[in-house]
């Protein structure tokens, strides 16, 4: 087949050998190659061709300068400011801002009609496939294991699985707070669906422990002795500032103080029931501890 074609000396194109003589005569007389695009153009229209095809124009979207002949291709495929549809909200967005827009748009949630959960847009398509299969299994009567329950940790602001919550609190919560919420010998974790019952149980234990009436003053030396015996087990652990800052009980007090120690009020910060004579000083220490914990959480994050 190569022998049936010949190359024109003027336009550098392959021409059928049968028509080569006629083509070359016409091409040399009437056509000339454009110096910009190297395309054969009639001699009388060369000036018009250069103005129309090779004139420098600017893109209206990105203001980039280019030849007029390349403008349409640039707008459709190369321009970084061309409008592109967001795959989540189906709105047109500039290509240069599309990635940032989709990161925010994909984080929005939508209610799944199958399971009633709020799912992020970027995971919605995958979730619907899983949800349909689960609904199909439910329709067939197959048993689906319930999702693992999680409990919110107020110290690190994360959701922790229920079966790991106790061990997580041992690392995340200060020692004194951990012992207060989880007394030694009772490591069970109450279900998160019964917060009021857990609060009542903790309040009852707190009320028994932190009610220093004058007729039970002799209990404090026993408490210090028991704490001193447990001290060697945790030499590296720091003492709770709240426990260190509580005032020592008076050795002798008038009858009016006895009535004041019988009146219990709840701390506005931690909710512990305390007698009136020591409530104010405890609240000051409790606010200081809460502010220091907030700073530690912000520094960690």
From Swiss-Prot:
InterPro entries: Innate_Immune_Apopt_Reg, TRAFD1-XIAF1_Znf, XAF1_C, XAF1_C_sf, Znf_RING/FYVE/PHD, Znf_TRAF. GO terms for cellular component: cytoplasm; cytosol; mitochondrion; nucleoplasm. Residues 193-205 have a biased composition (Polar residues). Residues 189-257 are annotated as: Disordered. A zinc finger (TRAF-type) spans 22-99. Disulfide bonds: none annotated. Its main location: cytoplasm. Interacts with BIRC4; the interaction is not detected in. Interacts with BIRC1, BIRC2, BIRC3, BIRC7 and BIRC8. Part of an complex consisting of BIRC4, XAF1 and BIRC5; the complex formation requires IFN-beta stimulation. Interacts with RNF114, the interaction increases XAF1 stability and proapoptotic effects, and may regulate IFN signaling. This is XIAP-associated factor 1. It comes from Homo sapiens (Human). The lineage of its organism: Eukaryota, Metazoa, Chordata, Craniata, Vertebrata.
């Amino acid at each position: 087949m190569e022998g049936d074609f010949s190359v024109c000396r003027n336009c550098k194109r392959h021409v059928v050998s049968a028509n080569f003589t006629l083509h070359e005569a016409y091409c040399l007389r009437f056509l000339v190659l454009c110096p910009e695009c190297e395309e054969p153009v009639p001699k009388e229209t060369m000036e018009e061709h250069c103005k129309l095809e090779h004139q420098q124009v600017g893109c209206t979207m990105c203001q980039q300068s280019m030849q007029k002949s390349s403008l349409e291709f640039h707008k459709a495929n190369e321009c970084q400011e061309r409008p592109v549809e967001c795959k989540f909200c189906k709105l047109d967005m500039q290509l240069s801002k599309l990635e940032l827009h989709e990161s925010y748009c994909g984080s929005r949630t939508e209610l799944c009609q199958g399971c009633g959960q709020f799912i992020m847009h970027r995971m919605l398509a995958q979730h619907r496939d899983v949800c349909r299969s689960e609904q199909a299994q439910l329709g067939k009567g197959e048993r689906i294991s319930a999702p693992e329950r999680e409990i919110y940790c107020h110290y690190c602001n994360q959701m922790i699985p229920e079966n790991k919550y106790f061990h997580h609190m041992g690392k995340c919560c200060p020692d004194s707070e951990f012992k207060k919420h989880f007394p030694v010998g009772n490591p069970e974790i109450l279900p998160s669906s019964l917060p009021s019952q857990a609060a009542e149980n903790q309040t009852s234990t707190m009320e028994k422990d932190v009610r220093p009436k004058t007729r039970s003053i002799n209990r404090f030396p026993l408490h210090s002795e028991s704490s001193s015996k447990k001290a060697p087990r945790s030499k590296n652990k720091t003492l709770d500032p709240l426990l260190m800052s509580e005032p020592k009980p008076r050795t002798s007090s008038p009858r009016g103080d006895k009535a004041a120690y019988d009146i219990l009020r709840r701390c506005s910060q931690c909710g512990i029931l305390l007698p009136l004579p020591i409530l104010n000083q405890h609240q000051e220490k409790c606010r200081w501890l809460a502010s220091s914990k907030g700073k530690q959480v912000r520094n960690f994050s």
